[in-house]
Amino acid sequence: MSTAIQPAGTAGGGGSDSNGLADVVDTILDKGLVLDAYVRVSVVGIEILTVDARVVVASVDTYLRYADAVNRLDIVNEDPKSDLGGLVGDVAESATSGVAKGKTTGVLEAAGEKLGDMLTSDEPEPRKATRVRSRRADR
């Protein structure tokens, strides 16, 4: 008795295997295959590391439908001032702007007072007295 082994591609009764890969690719492009990962590492509200990886094997239409459905068209859609770093930045910014505003206001007020004093002064400025020598005293 002899046994014959047929190659996998020529097995009988299975349908058309020549279109197998094309069917798989067509199905993947039609349905889409998306591997999406968003990782954020923070310590005490301060963001240290952000990894946003997206691997998509799909047609453009399929991907756009997916992205629209899960709101992933814009990768970063969060308020940057919602974390501790944003709040600390706001406090520091307001403190420095307050100090700068105070100094500027003080300088402007002092300059205004000085200018007002100069303009409203009724007294003539004192002149420096000069000596006039007579020729007779030198003789």
Curated annotation (Swiss-Prot):
<comment type="subunit">
    <text>The gas vesicle shell is 2 nm thick and consists of a single layer of this protein. It forms helical ribs nearly perpendicular to the long axis of the vesicle.</text>
</comment>
<dbReference type="InterPro" id="IPR047870">
    <property type="entry name" value="Gas_vesicle_GvpA"/>
</dbReference>
<dbReference type="InterPro" id="IPR000638">
    <property type="entry name" value="Gas-vesicle_GvpA-like"/>
</dbReference>
<dbReference type="GO" id="GO:0012506">
    <property type="term" value="C:vesicle membrane"/>
</dbReference>
<protein>
    <recommendedName>
        <fullName>Gas vesicle protein A</fullName>
    </recommendedName>
</protein>
<dbReference type="GO" id="GO:0033172">
    <property type="term" value="C:gas vesicle shell"/>
</dbReference>
<dbReference type="InterPro" id="IPR050530">
    <property type="entry name" value="GvpA"/>
</dbReference>
<dbReference type="Pfam" id="PF00741">
    <property type="entry name" value="Gas_vesicle"/>
</dbReference>
<keyword id="KW-0304">Gas vesicle</keyword>
<dbReference type="GO" id="GO:0005198">
    <property type="term" value="F:structural molecule activity"/>
</dbReference>
<feature type="compositionally biased region" description="Basic residues">
    <location>
        <begin position="129"/>
        <end position="139"/>
    </location>
</feature>
<feature type="region of interest" description="Disordered">
    <location>
        <begin position="113"/>
        <end position="139"/>
    </location>
</feature>
<comment type="similarity">
    <text>Belongs to the gas vesicle GvpA family.</text>
</comment>
<dbReference type="InterPro" id="IPR018493">
    <property type="entry name" value="GvpA-like_CS"/>
</dbReference>
<comment type="function">
    <text>Gas vesicles are hollow, gas filled proteinaceous nanostructures found in some microorganisms. During planktonic growth they allow positioning of the organism at a favorable depth for light or nutrient acquisition. GvpA forms the protein shell.</text>
</comment>
